[in-house]
C-alpha cells in the first residue's frame, strides 16, 4: 500500500468504522484533545456535517485522485450534500486565492517583489455544514447533541416548563461500566456507537454468535443477563416485545438476579406502560434504579447514532446516562412523571408512523390502479408539505422491491396493537390506527413479518 503523505489543510476521504468513506479536511485538533495512542492518525473534519474524528492514516485517501471512484460507489442524499459542500469550499477557496493574487499584482507594480507572505485563514464553517440551514443527518457520530427535558402539564403530570441544553464538543464517555442486553436491528447500532465513543461495554444476546463482532471491537462478553448486571453499573436492554422484556428480567439467570442496591437498569424496548410499571417495581424493590428510554428511529439511524431517545423514570439515572445517550442519539427527551410515560409517548409516535406508512402504501397502489405513474406520485409528494427522508426512502424502496428490514413490519404492527389497547384503556377512539393495524395483519398473513414495515404495500397488491 502506497504511503499517504498528508498535512493540515489537505482534503481527504476518511473511513470511520463501518461507515462509508466521507469527504473531509485535515485540521488541527483542539488543544485539549489528546491524540490516540498506537498507529499514526490525523484529525479530520467532515463536510456536510459538524463532525470530526481521529482517523488512522490507512483509512485516509487524498480527495481529488479518488473523487470519481468514491462518487461511483457511494450514493445517497447526505453523501451528495457532503460532496457539494466540498465543491463549494473549493470554489470559495479559489475565489480567495484569485482575489489575493490580484491584490498582490497591483501592489507589486512600481516596486521590487517582496517575499511571499503566508496567509492563514479560518475554516469556512458554512462549507462544512453543507451551506444549508437544513443540516443533513450525519453518517458519522455528531459532535453537537441536544438533551431536552420536556416537562408537561397533563392530567397525570404536573410539571413546569421546558428546558434545553446544547452539548458541544467531543463526547467524554462515562467512567461507569455499561451493560447491553439485546443485539437486534436497533441494539447492534447502539452498542457499536457506545464502543466507538470509548464506553466500556459488556454485551449479551440470546443468540451468542451476534456478540462476536462486538467482542472484536472491544466489548466484553456476559454469559447471562444476571452476570452482565452484576458486572456493570448501568445495564441497557433492547428487545422485541413485552414478553421478551419480562423474560429478560424475571426469567432464569435474569436481570433481577443480578440487581443490587444502586445498580441501574434502562429499558429501551418499545412495550406497553403496564410492562414498564411492573419492571420498575421489581427492579426498585431490590434497591435498583430504573429508567425507561425507548427510541424512535430505524436500523440506519441507530447505526448513524441519530436515534431520538424518550425517557421517563429516575431522573438521576437519565443524567448518569448522558454520554451514552449522546453516543447513540441526536436528541434525548426526559418526560417527567411516573415510569410508563415514555412508553405511552413512544406508542403514540409509532402509531402515527405506522398509520402513515400504511396510507402511503395505499396511495401508491391507488395510483397504479388508476393508471397513474407511481414515480410521478412520489416526485410530487416529495415536493410538497409531506416531503421527508422517511417518505422518500420508504417509497423508493417499495418501487425497487427492496423490503430489507430497517424496522420490522411485525414490530410496527405490535406497536399499533399496543397503542390501540392503550386507547381502549382510557376509552379513546383510535379508528385510523385500527384500520392500519388490519392492513399490517394482512401483510403478516402474507409472510411479511420479517420484512421492513414498508412491505405493508404487499397487502394491497395480493
From Swiss-Prot:
GO cellular component: chromatin; nucleus
Span list, region Dehydrogenase domain: 169-462
Protein name: Cytokine-like nuclear factor N-PAC
Pfam families listed in its UniProt record: NAD_binding_11, NAD_binding_2, PWWP
Keyword Nucleus: yes
Source organism, top-level taxon: Eukaryota
Gene Ontology biological-process entries: transcription elongation-coupled chromatin remodeling
Protein purpose: May have oxidoreductase activity. Regulates p38 MAP kinase activity by mediating stress activation of mapk14 and specifically regulating mapk14 signaling.
CDD domains: PWWP_GLYR1
Keyword Nucleotide-binding applies: no
Localization per Swiss-Prot or TrEMBL: Nucleus; Chromosome
Main location: nucleus
Organism expressing this protein natively: Danio rerio (Zebrafish)
Binding sites annotated in the UniProt record for NAD(+): 179-193, 270, 414
Region (Disordered): 91-139
PROSITE patterns: PWWP
UniProt GO molecular function: DNA binding; NAD binding; NADP binding; nucleosome binding
Domain-related comment: The A.T hook DNA-binding domain is required for the interaction with MAPK14.
Alphabetical UniProt keywords: Chromosome, Nucleus
Subunit structure and binding partners: Homotetramere. Binds to mononucleosomes.
Residues annotated as domain PWWP: 8-66
Amino acid at each position: 500500500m502506497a504511503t499517504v503523505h498528508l498535512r493540515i489543510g489537505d482534503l481527504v476521504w476518511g473511513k470511520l468504522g463501518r461507515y462509508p468513506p466521507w469527504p473531509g479536511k485535515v485540521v488541527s485538533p483542539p488543544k485539549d484533545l489528546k491524540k490516540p495512542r498506537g498507529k499514526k492518525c490525523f484529525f479530520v473534519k467532515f463536510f456536510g456535517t459538524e463532525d470530526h474524528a481521529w482517523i488512522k492514516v490507512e483509512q485516509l485517501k487524498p480527495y481529488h485522485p479518488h473523487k470519481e471512484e468514491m462518487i461511483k460507489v457511494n450514493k445517497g442524499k447526505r453523501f451528495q450534500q457532503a460532496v457539494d459542500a466540498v465543491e463549494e469550499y473549493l470554489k470559495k477557496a479559489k475565489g480567495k486565492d484569485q482575489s489575493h493574487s490580484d491584490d498582490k499584482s497591483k501592489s507589486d507594480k512600481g516596486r521590487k517583489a517582496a517575499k511571499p507572505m503566508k496567509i492563514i485563514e479560518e475554516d469556512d464553517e458554512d462549507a462544512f455544514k453543507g451551506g444549508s440551514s437544513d443540516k443533513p443527518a450525519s453518517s458519522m457520530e455528531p459532535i453537537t447533541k441536544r438533551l431536552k427535558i420536556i416537562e408537561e402539564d397533563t392530567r397525570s403530570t404536573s410539571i413546569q416548563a421546558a428546558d434545553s441544553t446544547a452539548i458541544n464538543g467531543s463526547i467524554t464517555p462515562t467512567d461507569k461500566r455499561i451493560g447491553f442486553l439485546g443485539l437486534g436491528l436497533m441494539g447492534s447500532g447502539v452498542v457499536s456507537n457506545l464502543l466507538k465513543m470509548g464506553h466500556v461495554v459488556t454485551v449479551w444476546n440470546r443468540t451468542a454468535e451476534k456478540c462476536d463482532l462486538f467482542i472484536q471491537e472491544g466489548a466484553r462478553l456476559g454469559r447471562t443477563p444476571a452476570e452482565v448486571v452484576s458486572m456493570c453499573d448501568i445495564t441497557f436492554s433492547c428487545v422485541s416485545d413485552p414478553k421478551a422484556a419480562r423474560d429478560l428480567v424475571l426469567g432464569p439467570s435474569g436481570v433481577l438476579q443480578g440487581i443490587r442496591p444502586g445498580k441501574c437498569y434502562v429499558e429501551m424496548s418499545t412495550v406497553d406502560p403496564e410492562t414498564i410499571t411492573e419492571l420498575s417495581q421489581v427492579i426498585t424493590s431490590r434497591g435498583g434504579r430504573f429508567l425507561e428510554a425507548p427510541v424512535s428511529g430505524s436500523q440506519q439511524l441507530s447505526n448513524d447514532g441519530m436515534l431520538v431517545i424518550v425517557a421517563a423514570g429516575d431522573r438521576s439515572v437519565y443524567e448518569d446516562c448522558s454520554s451514552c445517550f449522546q453516543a447513540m442519539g441526536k436528541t434525548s427527551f426526559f418526560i417527567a412523571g411516573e415510569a410508563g410515560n415514555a412508553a405511552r409517548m413512544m406508542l403514540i409516535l409509532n402509531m402515527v408512523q405506522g398509520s402513515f406508512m400504511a396510507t402511503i402504501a395505499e396511495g401508491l397502489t391507488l395510483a397504479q390502479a388508476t393508471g397513474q405513474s407511481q414515480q410521478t406520485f412520489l416526485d410530487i409528494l416529495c415536493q410538497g408539505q409531506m416531503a421527508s427522508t422517511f417518505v422518500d426512502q420508504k417509497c423508493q424502496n417499495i418501487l425497487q422491491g427492496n423490503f430489507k428490514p430497517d424496522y420490522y413490519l411485525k414490530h410496527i404492527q405490535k406497536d399499533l396493537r399496543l397503542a390501540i389497547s392503550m386507547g381502549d384503556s382510557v376509552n379513546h377512539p383510535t379508528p385510523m390506527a385500527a384500520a392500519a393495524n388490519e392492513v399490517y395483519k394482512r401483510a403478516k398473513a402474507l409472510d411479511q413479518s420479517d420484512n421492513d414495515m414498508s412491505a405493508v404495500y404487499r397487502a394491497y397488491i395480493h
